[in-house]
């Protein structure tokens, strides 16, 4: 993509209302634009990151055996009355009426819709286990939207729902999603900490939140220092058994590990999984015939990932004082190609044409060298190919690693081959 043909409205100065680095860089790098409190338009560069995150999630969810669906944003209130949850939600639920004066709502979550989706069709234990997921926009009218996409009112979420005939099956589904989440977050370059958590308005008796460590996190995490070692093994039962909790579940008096073993860190929540048995299937009459001929309520779980929140979380984890440093797996473009002067245009064009255009953002604008370098560092593409005077005299370009800052000279053909084969 040629920058001269692209829409990338970057900002030179830090917006005064943006308090944390991910919010500042999201606005300055032209990822998002706020249109109301907690509501954002996603601009081209930000949308590419969002789609790359979605692709990783879809790939791992599909590998787990989950099946993608798409449920409506707007839901009838009667489904929530049926589950008994309509009055549990306060003003964070956006309630509306249609032209027939029927009560509707903009879904903050989809447990009721998911239960309704299967209850008239799934009637036998032979139809289970089943796991359905979607990537869909949601709305929660937060009292204090803040931190950009980290705590917005409208947000993109991956939510999945598992259906099993009994507790053992439901626990298997829960453990599978726990393991799948670890794989998803690790592919994004993140180190997730799974902590025991309160089930909140979703309900149930088993729940884990997934956090990444960040000084700007709103939660305080208490976890055994062995957690990071076990993370590599992806041994779910061991990870679940080790001490790891958020601040609302930590009691210093009953903590089973010593102070020397206990790590205390700030964290950003990026995912949450729940097992809630028949909390929804019982009132909504979602049941199956078991293997021994009995009619039993379906055991359910739900599994959420904040897709749009992940954009902010990744920036919090990967940045410096110059800008964002995207992990290659989620970067909007892999390479930033910088043309430093008009007389090297032919060499820069050659490199651009030789590489995949959807992996390269080619700065072919007439701005100053300083502006070009600053902008490319700000948007944080993993690699920069800098085409200067040596491209004419010696057929040499500079290749910069954005994460390490290391700059290496390469012959033009060498650089083309290097990035064409990776």
From Swiss-Prot:
This protein's record includes keyword DNA damage: no
The UniProt gene name for this protein comes to proS
Protein's name in the database: Proline--tRNA ligase
Q: Which EC number applies? A: 6.1.1.15
The entry describes its oligomerization and partners as:
Homodimer.
Highest taxon above the source species = Bacteria
Give the principal location in a single coarse category. cytoplasm
Do the record's keywords include Aminoacyl-tRNA synthetase? yes
Which NCBIfam families does the protein's record reference?
Answer: PRK12325.1, proS_fam_II
Q: What does this protein do?
A: Catalyzes the attachment of proline to tRNA(Pro) in a two-step reaction: proline is first activated by ATP to form Pro-AMP and then transferred to the acceptor end of tRNA(Pro).
Database matches in PROSITE patterns: AA_TRNA_LIGASE_II
What is the originating organism of this protein? Wolbachia sp. subsp. Drosophila simulans (strain wRi)
């Amino acid at each position: 993509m040629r920058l001269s043909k692209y829409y990338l409205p970057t900002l030179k100065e830090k917006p005064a209302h943006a308090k944390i680095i991910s919010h500042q860089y999201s606005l300055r790098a032209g990822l998002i634009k706020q249109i109301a409190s907690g509501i954002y338009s996603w601009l081209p560069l930000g949308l590419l990151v969002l789609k790359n995150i979605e692709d990783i999630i879809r790939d791992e969810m599909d590998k787990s055996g989950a099946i993608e669906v798409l449920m409506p944003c707007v839901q009838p209130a009667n489904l929530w009355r049926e589950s008994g949850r309509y009055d549990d939600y306060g003003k964070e639920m956006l309630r509306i009426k249609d032209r027939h004066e029927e009560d509707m709502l903009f879904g903050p979550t989809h447990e009721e819709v998911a239960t309704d989706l299967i209850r008239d069709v799934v009637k036998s234990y032979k139809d289970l286990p089943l796991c359905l997921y979607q990537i869909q926009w949601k709305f929660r009218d937060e009292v204090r939207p803040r931190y950009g996409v980290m705590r917005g009112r409208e947000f993109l979420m991956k939510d999945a729902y598992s259906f099993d005939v009994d507790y053992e099956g439901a626990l298997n589904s829960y453990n599978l999603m726990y393991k799948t989440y670890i794989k998803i977050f690790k592919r994004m370059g993140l180190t997730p900490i799974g902590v025991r958590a309160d089930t909140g308005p979703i309900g149930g008796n088993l729940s884990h939140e997934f956090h990444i460590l960040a000084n700007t996190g709103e939660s305080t995490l208490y976890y055994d220092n062995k957690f990071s070692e076990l993370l590599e093994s992806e041994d779910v039962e061991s990870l679940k058994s080790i001490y790891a909790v958020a601040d609302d579940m930590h009691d210093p008096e009953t903590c089973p590990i010593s102070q020397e073993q206990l790590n205390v860190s700030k964290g950003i929540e990026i995912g949450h999984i729940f097992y809630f048995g028949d909390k929804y299937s019982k009132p909504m009459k979602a049941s199956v015939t078991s293997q021994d001929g009995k009619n039993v309520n379906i055991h359910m779980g739900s599994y959420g990932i904040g897709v749009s929140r992940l954009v902010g979380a990744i920036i919090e984890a990967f940045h410096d004082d110059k800008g964002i440093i995207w992990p290659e797996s989620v970067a909007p473009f892999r390479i930033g190609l910088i043309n430093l002067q008009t007389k090297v245009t032919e060499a820069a064009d050659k490199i651009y044409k030789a590489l995949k255009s959807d992996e390269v953002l080619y700065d072919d604008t007439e701005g100053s060298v300083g502006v070009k370098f600053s902008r490319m560092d700000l948007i944080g593409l993993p690699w920069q190919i800098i085409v200067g005077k040596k491209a004419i005299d010696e057929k040499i370009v500079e290749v910069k690693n954005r994460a390490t800052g290391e700059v290496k000279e390469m012959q033009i053909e060498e650089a083309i081959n290097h990035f064409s084969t990776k």
